[in-house]
Each structure stands twice: as C-alpha cells, then as structure tokens.
C-alpha cells in the first residue's frame, strides 16, 4: 500500500526543491510546518545525490522545532544517474519508512520524509544533517581501533538479533544483492583485466587474477549461504565509508540503499576486515568474533552460532570484500579502493578463504 507521501510529485532536479515542495514534504509528518526559503548549501553527487538544504521557516512555521539544515537524497543529476541508482533509492526510502522506526535505539540518521514514485523512478529521503552533531565520518584510509570495532559489533549484534530468523519486508533485495547481478560485467576479461592491472591491485594473489577462479570462489560463497545459519536483516554494505561516529565514539551506519535479508557473517566480515588495519585484524579478529557472538546470544530469542561454525562463515565471506578491487574510480577514489583491496587480499590468504570454500 502506498503512503500519502508517495502521491507527491518528486522533483527530478535540485531546482524542484522549492519552499512549497519542502513544506508539503515535511508537513506529512510535521503538520503546520511552513518553509519560506530554501537554499542549497553544498551537493555531493555519486550513485545518489545528497544536497544540503538550508531552510528559513515562516513566522510560526516551525512548531516542531525542526533543524535549519537537512539533506535531500535522491537522483537529481539526470536520467543516467536515476537509472543506475534508482533501485537503491527505493530501498532506502522504504527502509526509513518501514524499518528505521523499529531501530530507534540504534544510531542511524533521522529521516523527516521518505517517498518513492513508481512512474518517474525517483525516490527522495529528507534526512538529518549529521554535521550539526559534530560527528566524524568513517574512511577506509583511517582504520578503527579494536575497541571501536568491538562497539560496532555490539551495534550489529543488536540489529541482527532483533530480526533473527524473523520475516522482514519482502521489498528487501535478496542476498547477496547487486554484486551477483553484475558479476558477468565485473569478471569480463576486459573489465577485470583493467581493474586488476592497476597499481593499487598489486596485493591481489596470482590465482585471483584469473576471473574464472574469482567467479568460482564467489559462487562457492553464495552456495555456502545455506550453511551459514538463520537469516536476518543486514545492512548489506557495512564498510567504513558508510559509517559515522559520535563525539563519544558511538558508531552509526549511513547509506541504507542495500539492506537485505541475509547472513550475519556478511556484515561482520565486511566490517571487520575492511575497518581494521591488517595487523589489528590479525591480532584481534578471533576475540572480536567471540565478542559479537556473545552479544548476539544475549539478544532475546537468539541462539548464536558456535564459534567453529562462525569462524568458517567469517572466512568464507571474505570474497564479498575482495571484490573491492573491481571498484572503478568513478565510484570510489583510488586511495579508498587501495586500502580495502590490501586488507581483503591479506585476509583472503591469512584465512585461507579458498580452502574454506572447498576450492
């Protein structure tokens, strides 16, 4: 069933974010809001566009005490961007409408409006401007400490635990998401050769430069899913670039374009291997995995996997992050791709991922 918000016309460019449109959007959840002026104070364009809006309210037009700045996220930079990322925009809008209200005790950005339009393909979320809370945004070139990793695993255990083996929205994409859909393109001789031929790909083991070998490993990982344990709600893209940290160090997750019903080990392995330095990961990964399992097992109604099964699942899931090497520069800067490639290639060998997958 559509929400009343979905009946709104959703602008396809930034010029459409007028005072009247923002007033109408905010009034769905915050009646009697009246915006007098909107100015765009910075734009980040990628798979989705994120525009920082500075609002001026009419006298008496802010009875709910809304902030003077917020972010509008959607496809505002042409049909190609909308075609590329539109499915993700829909999922994020639906996440903030249906699932975020069930996660109020977890740190995620606030959302003031979320809507999707099946005709235009546009979806828009008006969300909190996190800079007003003096957060620090995660970046792969700045790995976290083992203590921060432990707190983040507590966050993930809380997310996973409350949806453990419980049906969640049918609108979620099936695990493993887009990576499986684009495998043929990623592993084509032309594309794979170009990506693994870059200097940043120097850590890639010789065997994995063969796209067919990589395909076999990915397919073995996906096939192993049935042995990983109960499904749950996962973030689906739990890397440092999708995280932020409050001044007291508490973590939060951004970018909910890829929530999935899938295996807990996807989030845990992707986060741990990608967020710790190689040295820290080698030193603390077993201890941190045990910590996650203890936190998961403390959730109501959850029987956490035993350590041996969890360790195997953790080793197998390294293949997800290994695919960072196939990320082109128009999607992520080279320094971010290089940092993740180094960490996942080291883990691939340290953890004998191919052997864990029966290859």
Where are these regions (language model features)?
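Short helix/strand-bridging catalytic loops that position acidic/His residues to coordinate divalent metals
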Residues: 136-145, 253-257, 272-276
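Secondary-structure capping and boundary motifs in well-ordered enzyme cores
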Residues: 42, 119, 148, 230-237, ...
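Active-site activation/catalytic loop segments of kinase-like enzymes and analogous catalytic loops
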Residues: 84, 94, 98, 258-261, ...
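Active-site acidic catalytic loop and adjacent metal/ATP-binding pocket
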Residues: 46-62, 71, 218-264
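Short acidic (Asp/Glu) and glycine-rich catalytic loops that position anionic groups and cofactors
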Residues: 2-3, 247-252, 266-273
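ATP-dependent phospho-/nucleotidyl transfer catalytic cores
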Residues: 135-235, 247, 343, 347-359
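Conserved ATP-binding subdomain of kinase catalytic cores across diverse folds
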Residues: 38-185, 264
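Regulatory N- and C-terminal appendages and interdomain linkers associated
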Residues: 1-46, 58-67, 139, 170, ...
């Amino acid at each position: 069933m559509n929400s009343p918000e979905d009946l709104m016309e959703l602008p396809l460019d930034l010029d459409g974010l007028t005072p009247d449109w923002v007033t109408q959007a905010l009034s769905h959840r915050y009646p009697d809001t009246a915006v007098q002026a909107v100015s765009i104070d910075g734009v980040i364009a990628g798979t989705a566009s994120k525009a920082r809006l500075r609002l001026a309210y009419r006298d008496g037009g802010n009875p709910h005490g809304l902030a003077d700045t917020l972010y509008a996220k959607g496809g505002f930079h042409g049909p190609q961007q909308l075609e590329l990322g539109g499915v993700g925009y829909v999922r994020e809008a639906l996440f903030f409408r249906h699932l975020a209200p069930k996660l109020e005790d977890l740190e995620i950005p606030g959302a003031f409006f979320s809507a999707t339009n099946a005709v235009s393909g546009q979806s828009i979320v008006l969300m909190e401007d996190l800079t007003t809370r003096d957060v620090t945004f995660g970046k792969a070139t700045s790995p976290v400490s083992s203590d921060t990793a432990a707190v983040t695993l507590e966050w993930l255990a809380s997310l996973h635990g409350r949806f453990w083996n419980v049906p969640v929205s049918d609108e979620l994409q099936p695990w493993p998401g887009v990576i499986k859909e684009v495998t043929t393109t990623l592993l084509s001789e032309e594309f794979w050769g170009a990506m693994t031929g870059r200097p940043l790909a120097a850590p890639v083991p010789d065997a994995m430069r063969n796209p067919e070998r990589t395909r076999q490993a990915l397919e073995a990982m996906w096939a192993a899913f049935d042995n990983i344990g109960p499904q749950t709600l996962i973030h689906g893209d739990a890397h440092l670039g999708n995280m932020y940290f409050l001044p007291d160090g508490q973590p939060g997750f951004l970018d909910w374009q890829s929530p999935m019903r899938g295996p807990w080990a996807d989030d845990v392995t992707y986060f741990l291997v990608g967020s710790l330095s190689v040295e820290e990961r080698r030193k603390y990964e077993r201890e941190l995995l045990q910590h996650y399992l203890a936190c998961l097992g403390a959730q109501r109604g959850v029987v956490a996997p035993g350590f041996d099964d969890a360790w195997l699942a953790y080793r197998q899931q390294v293949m997800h992050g290994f695919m960072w090497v196939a990320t082109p520069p128009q999607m992520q800067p080279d320094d971010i791709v290089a940092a993740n490639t180094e960490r996942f290639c080291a883990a691939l060998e340290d953890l004998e991922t191919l052997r864990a997958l029966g290859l």
